[in-house]
Curated annotation (Swiss-Prot):
<keyword id="KW-0255">Endonuclease</keyword>
<dbReference type="GO" id="GO:0004531">
    <property type="term" value="F:deoxyribonuclease II activity"/>
</dbReference>
<comment type="similarity">
    <text>Belongs to the DNase II family.</text>
</comment>
<dbReference type="GO" id="GO:0006309">
    <property type="term" value="P:apoptotic DNA fragmentation"/>
</dbReference>
<keyword id="KW-0053">Apoptosis</keyword>
<feature type="signal peptide">
    <location>
        <begin position="1"/>
        <end position="26"/>
    </location>
</feature>
<keyword id="KW-0964">Secreted</keyword>
<keyword id="KW-1015">Disulfide bond</keyword>
<comment type="subunit">
    <text>Plancitoxin is a heterodimer of alpha and beta subunits; disulfide-linked by a single disulfide bond.</text>
</comment>
<keyword id="KW-0800">Toxin</keyword>
<dbReference type="GO" id="GO:0090729">
    <property type="term" value="F:toxin activity"/>
</dbReference>
<dbReference type="Pfam" id="PF03265">
    <property type="entry name" value="DNase_II"/>
</dbReference>
<protein>
    <recommendedName>
        <fullName>Plancitoxin-1</fullName>
        <ecNumber>3.1.22.1</ecNumber>
    </recommendedName>
</protein>
<keyword id="KW-0540">Nuclease</keyword>
<dbReference type="GO" id="GO:0005576">
    <property type="term" value="C:extracellular region"/>
</dbReference>
<dbReference type="InterPro" id="IPR004947">
    <property type="entry name" value="DNase_II"/>
</dbReference>
<keyword id="KW-0732">Signal</keyword>
Length: 358
């Protein structure tokens, strides 16, 4: 057989394979250069009209770190634009809309305008799942009305300019998504947009359950699970149902890690939980955050949800969606934690002031 025919046959098979598999590249979190990355963290900064940095004045400033750049640094790229890690990551959903080669689920207790979520008391939880038959990402975040459904395109919502937010993106192999779905059934997420091609969800029935409004209805009311990122980093998912009825931070994370915590959560509502100092596990509410190279701000301007261990030698950081408020004890939700000295340092060192125990 002539070499030209062999080459043509090879190229034809390559193209056919790409079409059959779906997306040309495995689905992944993307970094600020639009390259696949195992995980990244974005700390969206509160709007500050007095800042010397235009993006912070406008309410679109961000700090960024990832597995390859393990220091939380200010990025001059505006979240309003589409050339940064968050936009690059969710763009896979938009560009593959209607093609049947990508599964996705968007959930948010405060969905975008015009979108509906399930009836009932859904969990206080926000995130995005997307995967093909090889890999995908889980974006855990605190941003109301984000992102827009797959039929639209990336846009940072105007309502999210004012306050601080946190976003954690993790890349997983396909086999982890059934486990993630099982965890999220405790959260009772408010799903407002989804696409689950049958060829991709045969091994992820729990993801299908999320879209069908199936959630945990019998004890135990909380569950933790180790998840492995695509590159082998262990993340621990802590998820609770509304009937668990306790504070995620004091009654679970602190006791699990056998450590005190600094907790930054939204406390602008009523019936806030005070800092707690019991049994040597001091759980402090952060009152002021100072991010080197970014900005300083009060907790009242920060809608993010994170916690760090305070015990010497422990380097755990948790990012999620639950606040330290009485009402949140009776809402589904959770946090995802990782043990990483650099991530821990970034968040631990940002604590400029905390509420003492009384």
């Amino acid at each position: 057989m002539p070499s030209s025919v062999i080459m043509f046959t090879f190229l034809a098979l390559t193209v056919l394979t790409a079409v059959m598999v779906g997306t040309s590249e495995a689905v992944s979190c993307m970094d600020n250069k639009n390259k696949p990355v195992d995980w990244f963290i974005v700390y969206k900064l509160p709007q500050d009209s007095a800042s010397s940095k235009p993006v912070i004045r406008e309410g679109y400033g961000q700090m960024y770190m990832d597995v390859n750049n393990q220091a939380l640094k200010f990025s001059s790229t505006s979240l309003k634009d589409d050339d940064h890690a968050i936009a690059y990551t969710v763009d896979d959903i938009y560009k593959n809309h209607g093609k049947g080669n990508l599964a996705h689920v968007m959930y948010n207790d405060q969905p975008p305008a015009g979108e509906e979520i399930q009836s009932g008391l859904v969990g206080h939880t926000k995130g995005v799942l997307a995967f093909d038959g090889t890999s995908g990402f889980w974006l855990v975040h605190s941003v109301p009305k984000f992102p827009l459904p797959a039929s639209k395109s990336y846009n940072w919502p105007d309502n999210a300019k004012r306050n601080g937010q946190t976003l954690l993106c993790i890349t997983f192999k396909y086999d982890q998504f059934e486990k993630i779905g099982q965890q999220l059934k405790y959260n009772y997420p408010g799903v407002y947009d989804s696409d689950l091609p049958s060829k991709l969800v045969g091994k992820t029935p729990s993801i299908v359950d999320l879209v069908k409004n199936v959630h945990v209805t019998s004890p135990p009311w909380n569950r933790q699970l180790n998840l492995q990122s695509k590159s082998g980093q262990t993340f621990v998912s802590f998820n609770k149902a509304s009937k668990w009825g306790e504070d995620l931070y004091k009654n679970w994370l602190a006791t699990h890690f056998k450590s005190g915590l600094y907790c930054e959560t939204w406390q602008n509502g009523g019936r806030n939980l005070n800092s707690s100092c019991e049994a040597g596990l001091n759980v402090y509410n952060v009152k002021k955050v100072s991010l080197s190279g970014g900005s300083d701000f009060k907790g009242t301007k920060d809608h993010s949800k994170w916690a760090v261990t305070t015990k010497s030698g422990l380097k755990w950081t948790c990012i999620g969606g639950i606040n330290r408020q009485t009402s949140q004890m009776y809402r589904g939700g959770g946090a995802v934690c990782l043990e990483n000295a650099n991530v821990h340092k970034a968040f631990y060192d940002s604590v400029a002031e905390y509420e003492p125990c009384t």
